Every structure is written in C-alpha cells, then in structure tokens.
C-alpha cells in the first residue's frame, strides 16, 4: 500500500475505515465508508475476518492474570494489528480504492481489562504498526480520555446511534455483542446509554464448550432446551452488578466462563441439561435488557438491534417477548446490523480529526464532553 502522506484538509465526503473486534472474539469486522455532513454514511466495502484460533485463545487467556503477560500482550497486539491490516487490504481491494484515498482508520482494539473504577481501561492494539502496515493514519485509544475524566469509557457508540437512528418518538438501540448495551434516544435530549449485562459472551462460551461450535446458530440449540425458571431467578439475583444504576459498563472481567460456572455450582436445584442452560442464558440476556429498559426508559416505543446477536432469531424472539415492543434489526433503518459498530469507529475517527467531543457525560458519567482518541500518523 502507498503511504497516505501529510495533513489533510477537512472536506465533505471523506473516506474512513472502521475496525472492530468485540468481546465475543469471533473475528474482526471492517467497513469502508464515505462520511459527509448532513448525509447518511455511504458503505463502500465490508470485510469480516475470522479470528485465528491461536490468537483468539491468547486474547481470552489475557483477560486473566498469568505468567509473562506483558510480553504475551505485546505479541498479541502485534498479531491483532496484522489481522486488522488484512481487513484493510480486503476493504481497499473490494472498493478499488488506494490507501491514499482514506483519511483515517478508526480502530478499537481488543479489551482485556476494563476497570474504570480504578481509573484505567486496556485495549490491546498496535496502532503504530497498523499505520506502518497500511500507510493510513490511525486513530485509536478512544476510551482512556473519557476514563481520565471520571467516566466509564463505555459505551462509546450512543452518539453515533443518535446520529443514525433518531426518531420523532422515544427509541432504543440495542447492541448485542459479547456484552449487551442500550442507547436511549429521546427527542430533544442527549443520548443516554449503558451496558445491561452479558449477551453473546456467555451464550458462545457455553455453546462452544458443549457442542464444539463457535456460536448457537439462530438459537437452534437453545430451542431444544427449556428455560429453567429457578435457575434464571438465581442468575438474576446473584449478581450485584445488575442492580447498579447507570452509568455502568462491564466485560469479560466479570461475565466469563468462571462467572457462569460459579453460579451453576451455587445453584441448589436439579442439575440442568446443557441445552436447558443455553435456553436459560438466552432468556437471561433478554430479561436483563428488558428490566434495564423498563427502569430507564419505560416510554420507549421501539427497539432497533445491531451486533452479532441481531442475527440470532431465537434471541430476538426472546427479546420481543420480554420487551413487549417491536424489535427489528437496524437494517430496517438503513444501516446493516453487522456493521454498525465498525461504522461507529469510522465515525469516531472523523470526530477526533474534527476535534468534535464524542464522549457523552450522560452516557459515561464523565465530568464533561471530551475529544476521544489518539492519532498515529502513517
């Protein structure tokens, strides 16, 4: 690829790339979009690359303390940057665009620690290497500036959701990644948003353990089981984080295989079959979302869903039942559900270059709006 060169003038119709690998660790998503003031983003290319098995295993391991983890984290960050660079190459080839046409890449990295209450969040990333490999300016490290201002550093996508999905009525946007998070859109008010609890992170973990498959396709395995009401209430009652008021955020630091195993071990009912646990976890995700929405925005009229979980028809059916509102993918509003989060990081890169604050205090609890990100020139 050709280097992108020196400073650019802020002009309408700039091209940005957004890259995202989420808590579920199923792969890296990339999107090439044209962003122009007053216009809907124009998607020029998309790419979804699977996460190499060895890298996925190492990233999972790095969510917990272990031997020589600083060295291992540095190597994993470099390997991840090479996956991202492959995604960039695929996008440019698909769109038949040179690297010089792209203003910047916005890349999230891979969260391995998120402890805003201790003043830090850590995303494994090698943005300098990504800039070197692609020849394109890279904007990264979007969360730490908000955390430095006393915020949660998450979720980051509500201002993008507000720009894309605002309606004349109260609406919610639900991102179903590894963790579920809600954006609440009320006409005439800044967006609010917060994490509601686990989504794919527990569903995928349990499915992989018992079926060998990376995820429960359309909730088919869950459909063979029965929701265990007593186990569901045990899961809901046994986690203090769920009762915390917003702003709040979470991740694999809390909701992981160890969390689930501990709850199953402390459950005093009959041992449930694996498929019954899967059905119960699916209902658990839907209930935590519904309970959070009812507490924070009971006048919400409809819910748009994005993220990997938007493809799970079984989970969407559970959500519709628990939410008692219309639930549909963001595709219905013109933005493909699979690419919303990657698009958000392209949008956040643009906001950084324009020095537009993208941190929303009503979402994160920060002391004020902040410009998010750091620049790594090509």
UniProtKB/Swiss-Prot annotation:
Transmembrane segments: none
Pathway involvement of the protein, from the record: Amino-sugar metabolism; 1,6-anhydro-N-acetylmuramate degradation; Cell wall biogenesis; peptidoglycan recycling
Gene3D superfamilies registered for this protein in UniProt: 3.30.420.40
Single GO molecular function: ATP binding
Residues annotated to bind ATP: 22-29
SUPFAM superfamilies hit by this protein: Actin-like ATPase domain (SSF53067)
Record has ATP-binding as a keyword: yes
Uppermost EC category: transferase
Keywords assigned by UniProt, alphabetized: ATP-binding, Carbohydrate metabolism, Kinase, Nucleotide-binding, Transferase
Single Gene Ontology BP annotation: peptidoglycan turnover
Catalytic activity as recorded in UniProt: 1,6-anhydro-N-acetyl-beta-muramate + ATP + H2O = N-acetyl-D-muramate 6-phosphate + ADP + H(+)
EC number(s) recorded for this UniProt protein: 2.7.1.170
Pfam families reported for this sequence: AnmK
Family according to the record: Belongs to the anhydro-N-acetylmuramic acid kinase family.
Protein's job: Catalyzes the specific phosphorylation of 1,6-anhydro-N-acetylmuramic acid (anhMurNAc) with the simultaneous cleavage of the 1,6-anhydro ring, generating MurNAc-6-P. Is required for the utilization of anhMurNAc either imported from the medium or derived from its own cell wall murein, and thus plays a role in cell wall recycling.
PANTHER family for the chain: ANHYDRO-N-ACETYLMURAMIC ACID KINASE
Protein name listed in UniProt: Anhydro-N-acetylmuramic acid kinase
Upper lineage: Bacteria, Pseudomonadati, Pseudomonadota, Betaproteobacteria, Burkholderiales
């Amino acid at each position: 690829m050709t280097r992108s060169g020196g400073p650019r003038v802020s002009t309408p119709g700039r091209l940005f790339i957004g890259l995202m690998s989420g808590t579920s660790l199923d792969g890296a998503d990339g999107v090439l979009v044209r962003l122009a003031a007053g216009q809907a983003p124009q998607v020029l290319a998309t790419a979804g690359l699977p996460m190499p098995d060895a890298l996925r295993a190492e990233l999972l391991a790095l969510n917990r303390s272990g031997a020589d983890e600083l060295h291992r984290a540095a190597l994993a960050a470099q390997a991840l940057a090479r996956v991202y660079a492959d995604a960039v190459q695929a996008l440019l080839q698909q769109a038949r665009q040179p690297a010089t046409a792209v203003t910047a890449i916005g890349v999230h990295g891979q969260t391995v620690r998120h402890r805003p209450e201790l003043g830090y969040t850590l995303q494994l990333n090698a943005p300098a290497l990504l800039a070197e490999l692609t020849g394109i300016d890279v904007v990264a490290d979007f969360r730490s500036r908000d955390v430095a201002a006393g915020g949660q550093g998450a979720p980051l996508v509500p201002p993008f959701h507000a720009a894309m999905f605002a309606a004349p009525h109260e609406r919610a946007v639900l991102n179903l990644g590894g963790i579920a998070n809600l954006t609440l859109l009320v006409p005439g008010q800044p967006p609010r948003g917060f994490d509601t609890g686990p989504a794919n992170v527990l569903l995928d973990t349990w499915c992989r353990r018992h079926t060998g498959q990376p995820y429960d396709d359309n909730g088919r395995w869950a459909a063979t089981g029965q929701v265990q009401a007593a186990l569901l209430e045990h899961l809901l009652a046994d986690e203090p984080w769920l009762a915390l008021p917003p702003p709040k955020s979470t991740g694999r630091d809390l909701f992981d295989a160890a969390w689930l195993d501990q709850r199953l071990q402390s459950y005093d009912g009959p041992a449930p079959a694996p498929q019954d646990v899967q059905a119960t976890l699916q209902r658990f995700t839907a209930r935590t979302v519904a309970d959070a929405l009812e507490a924070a925005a009971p006048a919400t009229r409809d819910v748009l869903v994005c993220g990997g979980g938007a493809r799970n028809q079984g989970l969407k059916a559970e959500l519709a039942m628990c939410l008692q509102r219309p639930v549909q993918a963001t595709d219905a509003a013109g933005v493909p559900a699979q690419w919303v989060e990657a698009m958000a990081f392209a949008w956040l890169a643009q906001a950084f270059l324009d020095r537009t604050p993208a941190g929303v205090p009503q979402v994160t609890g920060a002391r004020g709006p902040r410009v998010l990100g750091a620049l790594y020139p090509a």
